[in-house]
Amino acid sequence: MADPTELLHGTLDTLVLKTLAWGPRHGYAIARWLEAMGTDVLKIEEGSLYPALYRLERRGWIEAEWGLSETRRKVKLYRLTDAGRARLAVETAQWSRFADTVARILNAPTSVTS
């Protein structure tokens, strides 16, 4: 299998949008949730996450505001915008189609010829 870091590079924006679909979160919480859901496959580095957050904010798909964490520390909370929700729907449909196609190819019998 390819290096999970390489696979993550092309999907991190979509995964962040999905994480924020459940409500506002700060960067550390986003990373921990993705790692928990990705079991041993996903490792989210700050050097990847924060550029993704800034990129998504510039595109208008998320917005940020200062708030308090569960431990009452000041944190930047990210929230999905309506445009981000629409983008997530598009990305989800594209990934579902792509994953179905890859699964069909990988599960095809090896004796099939064209």
Briefly describe each language-model feature range.
Residues 11, 15, 75, 79, ...:
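Amphipathic alpha-helical recognition patches that constitute DNA-binding helices
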Residues 73-92:
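Basic, amphipathic "hinge/linker" alpha-helix immediately C-terminal to the N-terminal HTH DNA-binding motif
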Residues 4-48:
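N-terminal helix-turn-helix DNA-binding core of bacterial DNA-binding proteins
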Residues 2-6, 66-67:
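Short beta-strand/turn micro-motifs at beta-sheet edges
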Residues 49-56:
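Basic amphipathic alpha-helical segments that dock to polyanions
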Residues 86-114:
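Amphipathic alpha-helical dimerization/coiled-coil segments
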Residues 57-74, 79:
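Beta-hairpin "wing" of winged helix-turn-helix
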